[in-house]
Amino acid sequence: PAPCEAACTLNINSQPVGIKSIEHAIIDRAWAEGWVQPQPAAHRTGKRVAVIGSGPAGLAAAQQLARAGHAVTVFEKNESIGGLLRFGIPDFKLEKSHIDRRIDQLIAEGVVFRTNTLVGAVQDAATLAQGVTVVTPEELQRSFDALLLAGGAETSRDLPVPGRELAGVHFAMEYLPQQNRANAGVALPAPISAQGKHVIVIGGGDTGSDCVGTANRQGAASVVQFELLPMPPQQEDKALTWPYWPVKLRTSSSHQEGCEREFAIATKVFNGAQGQVTGLTTVRMQ
């Protein structure tokens, strides 16, 4: 979101410098012109570092450690590298080719990637069936000089209200990654599809917006987004908010594609019939 733009002094009485767009233009030109090249370390330290997790933090750390001369191995439990960038952010917001070209650069700099490898408990039947290899922390400690934990946070915030167990109620991190996998050509055993359905997205943030856009692309009959907080102002009072990131109404491309937005709504009950969600009981907040 480029929060620094809100703190730009020009933003007090005019428009801030669009540094996000400027930096995008610079790096896009750099890749197009071939200015971005691998930078392998000139000298090796002889030290081995294991990076656990291949999301933004893991990839950034792996690159800097490799350039410092360390031998870096990145362990990723999923089938592809990228973490939230690859599986959480929809393709219509982030084309995965941007991730792939950075991974190619890291490989050229000496970084080794091990996918389908879970760092955790002892191997069991469930992980074996999924084709995932389990490596214990003790094994890594014996093989590496340092471990960097960059696993991220994948525990969803639940909504513990009656009816939560009904079929058809999904976490965003169940819904978004499976669609990204489908886009990549992965066969899904039980895909979650909004096609022809009336969809309610609970949560008014960026993740909710991503779910709105995904549901629209799947052919949802209708999409409604619920936000617990009251509707923010269309325009912030800069005398009060500057230099902080302002709270104001933000409309994404997903909203523009088709979405009804409701504010100050709290969901109290998931209603259902025969184990399937059929509606919600909500209250309007004051």
Where are the language model's segments positioned?
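Ferredoxin-like iron-sulfur electron-transfer modules
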Residues: 1-2, 35-52, 57, 86-87, ...
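Iron-sulfur (Fe-S) cluster-binding segments and ferredoxin-like electron-carrier domains
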Residues: 2-29
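Glycine-rich dinucleotide-binding loop and its adjacent helix/turn
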Residues: 26-43, 104-115, 156-218
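N-terminal Rossmann-like FAD-binding beta1-loop-alpha1 element of flavoenzymes
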Residues: 48-73, 207-218
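Cofactor-binding loop segments of dinucleotide-utilizing enzymes, especially the Rossmann-like FAD-
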Residues: 54, 77, 204, 228-231, ...
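Glycine-rich FAD pyrophosphate-binding loop
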Residues: 70-86, 223-233
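Short, hinge-like loop/turn segments at secondary-structure boundaries
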Residues: 90-94, 165-167, 240-246
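A Rossmann-like FAD-binding core segment of flavoenzymes
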Residues: 97-158, 180-189, 216-286
